[in-house]
């Protein structure tokens, strides 16, 4: 691979490997003749300080570094949450009922669920998940979240005998409905994943669910904040911009990345403590 004339850069993304394996991977990366951007989710940044290896702090940061490196620019600092999103979140906080304090995350992408947990923990929040990272706890109930809970709907327990939620979102949408109806839920956090093989129009089945949740919350004198991000490119068959616009028209705060969405949710939860 390192001798390929077409290859310009390598990006390594993984959940943190065992220390011994990580050292071997990084030693191999250091020998590459091409730049190597590395993001091991949850790994200590200092453990990635190897000559020839460029550490990234998030999935988005890894992409930003890769683009900058290919353009001959200096590796950028990690992007902060946009003030426009923070302002909209502040407006929503004031409309919430007293019991609304929790983040409920429902993810089709397991890596996004993992990264979101890390973001909550970094903000000083405890959380639970069916796929907990170090520092998080197991779900107390597989059917319904309690406190701040983030569920990976692509986990084996949800996909045995049925399509992955990226392909068929029925089970994911049902979980969104269940978590959004909980009177303690302040933020409903989710992802939309585009690409070949994924649902042809994710928003088509999702929007009725979000509309139902909004109406029920209003009737109960609650305000449910919806936060999402769309993973994909303009070359994907689902039309990324159209999916974003549909979500925004439905009142969803659409972040540029999963890490921005998770940090925005954490910001709200900290204000609701």
Task: Locate predicted features.
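Charged helix-capping and loop-helix junction motifs
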Residues: 202-209
């Amino acid at each position: 691979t390192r001798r390929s004339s077409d290859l310009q850069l390598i990006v390594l993304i993984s959940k943190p490997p065992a220390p011994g394996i990580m050292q071997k991977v990084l030693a191999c990366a250091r020998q590459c003749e091409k730049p190597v951007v590395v993001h091991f989710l949850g790994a200590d940044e200092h453990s990635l300080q190897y000559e020839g290896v460029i550490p990234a702090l998030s999935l988005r940061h890894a992409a930003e570094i890769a683009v900058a490196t290919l353009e001959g620019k200096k590796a950028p600092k990690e992007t902060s949450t946009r003030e426009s999103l923070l302002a909209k979140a502040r407006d929503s906080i004031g409309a919430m009922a007293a019991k609304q304090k929790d983040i409920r995350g429902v993810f089709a992408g397991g890596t996004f669920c993992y990264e979101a947990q890390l973001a909550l923990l970094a903000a000083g929040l405890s959380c639970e998940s069916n796929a907990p990272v170090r520092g998080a706890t197991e779900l107390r109930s597989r059917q319904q979240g309690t406190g701040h809970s983030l569920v990976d709907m692509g986990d084996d327990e949800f996909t045995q005998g049925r399509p992955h939620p990226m392909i068929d979102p029925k089970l994911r949408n049902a979980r969104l409905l269940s978590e959004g109806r909980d009177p303690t839920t302040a933020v409903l956090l989710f992802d939309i994943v585009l690409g070949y093989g994924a649902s042809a129009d994710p928003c088509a089945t999702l929007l009725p669910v979000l509309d139902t949740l909004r109406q029920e919350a209003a009737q109960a004198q609650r305000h449910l904040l919806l936060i999402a991000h769309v993973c994909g490119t303009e070359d994907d068959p689902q039309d990324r911009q159209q999916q974003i616009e549909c979500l925004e028209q439905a009142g969803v705060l659409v972040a540029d990345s999963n890490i921005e969405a998770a940090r925005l949710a954490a910001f709200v939860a900290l204000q609701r403590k």
